[in-house]
Amino acid sequence: MSSFAALNLSTNENADESKDHSRELQVEESSKIFQLALIQLKAKRFDDAKETFDRLFEIDVIKPNKWGLYEYSSPTLDSLRYLAYRNRGILHYQYAKENFKQMESDDVVEHILKTLECLLESLQHGEADNTVTHLLLKIFWSFNSTKLSRTILEYELTRSPEEIRLLSSLSAMFKDQKRVFKQYSQLLKKLHVTSLPQNIPTAVEAVLNCIETCDVEEGQIEPLLKDIKAMKTEDDEILKELDGSNLNLNELSWEELGVSLRSLVPKTKVVNILGRKSDTYSDLEAPIEYVSFTTDEFMEKLSDSSNESPGHSPEHFEDAVSVMPETNNIEVSVEREPSAKRQDSTDRPAQRSSKRFKEREKVQEPDVEQQVEFHTYIINEINQSLHVSGIEKDISIEELDPNNVAKRQELCMSDFYDCLTSWTNKHTEFLKQGQENFSVKGSTDDFTQLTMLLRSSMFSGDVEPTDSLSEIEAEDVRRFIRDVNDKKLHFHAVRFLFIKELLKLREDGTCLVTDYFWSPALYEVVEFFSMAIEVNLYQMIEPSTDESTVSIAVSIFEIMTNMMGNICNDLANKKAQGQKYNELESQRNKLQRKIVRWYEMLLSKPLSTKLKFRFQWSHFSCLQCTTDVTNSTLITTIEDIENSLKEFPDFGTVAYSNYNNISSLSLKTVQSQFSKIKMLRRFTIVDIENEDEDNTHKDYIEHLYCILNQIPCEGTDFQSLLSFVNTSPFLMKLKLWKLLLNYFASRKDQLRFQNCFFSSIKFLLARLSSEEYQIQSQLQRQQTLLSTLTHIGEFSKRFFQVLCDNWDMSLKNPSRDQLQVLVSIFRLLYPLVFYETLTEKNASLKSFFKKAVKSSITIQDIFLTVASLMILCHKFITLEKENAKEEFTGSIIDLISALHMLAGKFEFCDRFDGNFLKVQEKLLCEFSNDSAFTHLKRELWCRYHISIGLDNPEDQHQTHAQPMVKANAIMLSNYFIKFQYQDRNILVLSNNRSNFKQFFETVMELIGDIDYEANHVLSRNEYFFNQYFTAPITLKTIRDAYAGEFEIEFTSPNDDLQSGVDGGLFYVSAVHALNQYKARKKSMQARPSELDAIISTLTTDILYNTKRFESWYLLGKCYSFVVEDDLTWTSDKLASRDKKQATAFAEKKAILCYLMALSLYLSTFKETTSEQMKNDNKIVFRNLLESLGKEMLQAYVKPMSSMSYTWKLKPVLVLKADGSLENLPISYKPSISETNILRCILMILAKADTLYNKDEERNWMNPFYISKVHFKTDRKLFKESGICLLQDSCRLALLQSSVSGSDNILEAHYALVSYCYKCFKDRTFSLAEAISHLREDNGFFGLPEEEWQVEDDKSFFNLIIRLLKYILSKDKQKWQHRPIYRIAQIKYTEFEDTDGAMKEMNKLLALKSVNKNVVNIWKPENELPGKHFVYAYQYVLFYMDLLNEKHDFMAIGGMVKKLRRFGSGMINSQDAINKAVELFVNGAKVKLSLNEKEHGELLMQRIPFPEFVELSEELFNAFKKGDYQSDVLDVFLLAYNLKKGTNSIQFDGVCITIYFKYFYCPFVENKKQSTPYPAPIIEGISGPQPENSPSQQLPQSQSQPQLPRSPSPNTANNKEKTAKTPVKNPTSIRKRVSKRDVFDRVVKLIEKRLS
């Protein structure tokens, strides 16, 4: 049950008394703390006082609760709280007063505010004294707060009215009181107060009347308060200032103004301001009370100079025309002048350079003449190449020089130079006008595309060339800035004024937004501001009838109409793509309501003619967006506009160049739009009526094709369509061309697609030579030129893209006229690069590539697109000719080289998304000659930054590397393989280029790992491939392979890698990788894991069904290297049959790979046509046979011992007699007999030996291994033919050693000596025959004739030893070990010279070395892998026999220790250890006469355990090492160490026997002789005593108790003595001494006394 009881419900009086008492104690404690705080404050220990006050306010009776209320109140507590807060406030004030000079201003203010807080809080608990009121009055004075000062003064005056009455006489007042009255009087005057408040006593009023004329001494103001007052005054001044924004303008333009103003408000999309919260200005945290603009002084001067007359700035005019043609037309020259004054793409002025800097630039000026020579060379190369295609008209430097261009004939080129010279933002916008999406979105149906095209073209028309706003804006902008800065207008006012200036109708009848070309950024700002304050603008304009104001309404209506077009277009696109469009519909509805409201307002306004037409035309444009073409209102509206415009023939044109969805307004454009609507209505009706028929649609496309290509045609609606096209504006015709190109591209009609492209390009070029172009102003011509170039680029890119996607960059029967069109465009674009050369010549010209980076990239792309098409067109025209094909091929390569050098010179050859380099790569890979390869290397660097032996650094152009795609990688790899290894086998060539190796590694890394499971054909092939290696090696397998009938039924996957694999990509990559592995292996740096990637690569080549026998051969070599590595470095994998399985399987794989390679070669060698390739393949085939024969021999001999020729039986379950099932043990059966293995080896090696054309080229190993097999299998056959083959091998080895100059080949010579010795021993050879065979190799030995005269066996053996030593003397690397062993074996066997044999064997074995090696031999280069482990085992056994012969069992014991650590250095290490242990134990037993049964087992049975423990302990205590023979101790210690190393029981007998025989028993006997009591006598253990027996040295006085022992069956006396022995507890069972007990004593004795 809870023990809680609410206090307010408790009736316990004791509890209330306890609370009261506790509260009283807290009050007392608070008083003490308060007094301490006062003392510290008085002593100015501010920090201590602060801490004390903090403690005070932590007491419950002082601090309020969380709501600021006090639970208990009393006069004492109120007084205490008042004093606490009062003095705490004074503490903060005093601290600030003393330290304000060292404090930050923020800290000073913080302390003053805390002072106010505490003092004001004190007033809540008591009446303030004079100190508090005067301090508050001073602080409020420093705050400049009259209201707070008046409050405190009135508080002071009304605090004690009686005191004021008593002190009504001024003479009776204190100075402070007079000062209060004086301040209050002055304050009332300042506030213009005539009557006092009602709470002021009348006595105060009397004093105030007197105080006005009385002089009162002013109190001194403390410095702290003066500082506070100054800060407050400064803050007040700052607050009075307007919160404005100063915008720094980088240029005098409306765009800069608009973007700067836009940056002041939060950014959002224009469509997002269509809702209720339209103006983002409301999201600002603080208002913008005024806006001001600042401009750069230098920019002002530049703008001022731009308004000067041409005569006032001759240097600008000179700069402008320095690259312009001379002309007699003054108007044109004047027009060009302002454009030259424009700066870079951002329209920023260039900084001035110092004279010293200019001089430095002049010194480093490039060789311009050399640059001109470069252009001359390039143009000559291009002309010569084009002559082959029949292009007679040359391009010349003279016509490209701007000073030589004829005005009328090459006006477009002259205009192009003008643009490059004076490029500004407006030129960038001109260039962007031609950029639009080429493809038509929507249905793939062709007729529907045509309908959509007509419908989309209704929203826009031709972009009429118009003057740029930047040409006239400087003075207007300057005036605008001046007005804003002078008047300090609010942001709203500045924004409205900005909109008004740009949207209103000017005095000259123009409107900036419709009649001048703007940048998109400026239009976006105007659109954003207009829609943001649309409601305010409507309210302002709606009651007005002023034309200027109403014109703003028309402009805003046009802006909303254009926005409606954008929304409707996005809505249509999203519907066509199946995306969500709910938000767009909502935006459209909101905007529609605004448009309707403005439309109704404008209908009621009186409009001038131009405004009326603008309003009607924008209304018509809005109808086009929002209604269907069948809407009658649409037709009525445009008919009314057309009829009205006919009444005003001088109306002119409203350009609308800034609107995407409002076309230009003129009678011509109205009629064009009307025509489009009529045509669209016709198509719509046809589409409805012929919903299921397609013929009509095709007819319209066919008619359109004939009309645009000017081909005669007839048919329904042909004339109407012809009329429509002829009257269509330029952009409409352009869209029709795009429609046709898309149509024929989708139909893959290459011929018509190609014809349409070249016809459309001619159409675009004709625009630049038209009369209309000639009569335009310079700026208009520049606009037309740049937009036309963009259109040419878009058409060319589309044409190139379709060629790549559909027809692999191939043209269909291109004509010379078509090539001439491309050459004309190229010639027009050549000023792009020629101008860069001129900039290096003339310092006043700035590089176009540097001043307009983005625009230059666009034109560079066009340049490279045209150049790429030129190359392709020239290639297909030249290759049509049958004669002089090599010359034509050279012209193609020369053209590629010239164009690449040109683009690379100016560092843009990688533009056009790398397609220019892609074209070169594609074409150059078709020509397998040195010239093509040279240029291809340069292309590879520029495109991928892959360097393949680039000799000239200038060929390494500054480009950005592109990632290589798989298709290009395969194409290039096939080319390089074909180019480098033409009609040759790569395995035969000795000089493989390392440059290609890097390339192939890059390609293989790009391709990556192949997922066989992703392709069912590869999965199938992989399964058969793996199954092949599980089959055993049988005689039938070898026969089928040798007959060429052995194969695996692979299928080609024919995927994207097939061509690359067939071309040899994976095969060549594997060859390079394997060569690298061999080189690393030779220097012992290779790792077998490196072979995994090579095996995987070769496996891929095989699985793709290439039927390349070399791949199988190399795969076998890889597995051979794996086996060699397993058998060379360590014998761990040879320790048991299970461990050898992995190596045997790899060896089996190698043999099977060789057999498959053999079969493939024999079945396909007749298909090779080239004699050179046949000879190369024959050499590879010979190497294959040698590898196969060697591998089969290696698998047959030790240490593998034919494991690869076995097969594992499947598990078998046997039913036993008791009915249970039993698994038979797994067994291995030979898959081929040993006889057949050896026959196959002999046949293969013999066949390989016959394939050598010259005798000196023969491989010495072939006859060597054949003779070796004969020697091992049949000595008779060896005598007949084997010895001759061996002598042949010695001759070849000697010849090849002298030719190569490397280490001598000694294996054959040793084999000859060894085999002759063995054959003489087994009587195969007689002495004379053996000498005769040895003399055949005297060319190597070089012995004089008399040394060959041997008459007896001993002399023959000495001759053998001399020959073996001579072989060792020729061993430079000292790796030959077999002759040493043979010498030792002959000395031991024939001469019984054990010491001499051991001396020889000590050269091979190192028992006393500190390392773990026992046998110091290594595998010679020509020795079969793994044989050195066999030989090491043989040498160890032979050495142990020699030691045993010398009875050196201690050395044998030492061998045991080393053999345990040398286990990985030979085979059968455990057998060797067991033999060494056996020899050591037997030797120790013989040497020390040890009998384990007598001195071990029987003795342990007879000794009582207590006696053994007691005596063993005494023996341990009395043991001295010098009392025993050293040989006994050495054997004892060695046996223990050997036992300790293996924990084996083999050494237990030796250790225990020595312990009892030489230590324990003599100690007991000595004990028996020295004691007066009967000592235990143990029968039959008295062995031979050492001379210094410990029994002679035991003290005589030592007593020895009699030990119980077992009765001896041999003597009766022992029985009597035993009967007299006292026995304790005879009924107990006696514990016997075990081996473990004895060995514990042995361990203790050795480790404590001997170690």
Swiss-Prot record:
SS bond list: none
Biased composition (Low complexity): 1589-1609
Residue ranges, compositional bias (Polar residues): 1-13
Subcellular location: Nucleus
Region (Disordered): 1-22, 333-368, 1575-1632
TPR repeat coordinates: 30-63
Basic and acidic residues bias: start-end ranges: 333-365
GO CC terms: HIR complex; nucleus
Major location (coarse): nucleus
Keywords, ordered alphabetically: Chromosome partition, Nucleus, Repeat, TPR repeat, Transcription, Transcription regulation
Biological processes, Gene Ontology terms: chromatin organization; chromosome segregation
InterPro entries with a match to the protein in the record: Hir3/CABIN1 (IPR033053)
Gene Ontology MF terms: nucleosome binding
Superkingdom of source: Eukaryota
Homology family: Belongs to the HIR3 family.
Physiological role: Has a role in a nucleosome assembly pathway that is required for the integrity of heterochromatin and proper chromosome segregation.
Identification of the protein by name: Histone transcription regulator 3 homolog
Origin species: Kluyveromyces lactis (strain ATCC 8585 / CBS 2359 / DSM 70799 / NBRC 1267 / NRRL Y-1140 / WM37) (Yeast)
Gene that produces this protein: HIR3
